[in-house]
């Protein structure tokens, strides 16, 4: 690949692989070090991981803010230190007496605009250190609740196995939501503990599994073809097309003499090139200012 070429890949990350390993594989296949991803997926999880190559890495912070879809399995009756199947068991409780109606009601209480305490084993920094590093060192970690939106959280199937209950769920939630924490909190609400045994991300904003590139971990994997930055931006944000004269000013980050339609708006030249992301100017009515210039 020409290292000046930039674009976005949608990778279907397999379970058992870290997000960083996906980045490493893309670096080797694409022949460039400048690769990043939008929104980490835990090693046990599979599904959509949006990857930026070269200049497209500058889009990732904005792409990661989209809402996301997941399918998952919640096991009720067992809690773990990580809130998923990777961690040590912290509690076991007979969940067999819990009926389906109670499960649905507990899930409803985790729907909408909620205050969620993130999973303790997470990449959130506490006093300059990652929370997961503190937990692994045996330190107590107290994370503050954060506002998240869970617009959909539904049970698709409920399966009973002795003292535990497995609930297959589908969820749509805002950036920053921990599905592991939803499992934990449903279990806590029901008084039996809960954790995730499976997690698959099926969508990040406009990017879903149908857009996933070839299997990059196959032995005979070929260099994937990324979508252009303009294509990715047009899927993700409102678009404003500008003239050649306007494009010249945008290339140096000047204000625009009109208000763009959204807090993140893609500016595309007559040539089809993505020039920048702009937002309305809070200080000057009727103008817009650059979030980032991409050329």
UniProtKB/Swiss-Prot annotation:
Keyword Calcium listed: no
Disulphide bond pairs: none
EC main group: isomerase
Active site: 42 (nucleophile)
InterPro entries from the UniProt entry: PsdUridine_synth_cat_dom_sf, PsdUridine_synth_N, PUA_sf, tRNA_psdUridine_synth_fam2_C, tRNA_psdUridine_synth_TruB, TruB_C
UniProt keywords, alphabetically: Isomerase, tRNA processing
EC numbers: 5.4.99.25
CDD domains named among the record's database cross-references: PseudoU_synth_EcTruB (cd02573)
Key word Lyase present: no
Catalytic activities: uridine(55) in tRNA = pseudouridine(55) in tRNA
Molecular function per GO: RNA binding; tRNA pseudouridine(55) synthase activity
Ranges in coiled-coil conformation: none
GO biological process: mRNA pseudouridine synthesis; tRNA pseudouridine synthesis
One Pfam family named in its UniProt record: TruB_C
Purpose: Responsible for synthesis of pseudouridine from uracil-55 in the psi GC loop of transfer RNAs.
NCBIfam families, sorted: TruB (TIGR00431)
HAMAP family xrefs: TruB_bact
Protein family (similarity comment): Belongs to the pseudouridine synthase TruB family. Type 1 subfamily.
Protein name: tRNA pseudouridine synthase B
Species this protein is from: Cutibacterium acnes (strain DSM 16379 / KPA171202) (Propionibacterium acnes)
Gene expressing this chain: truB
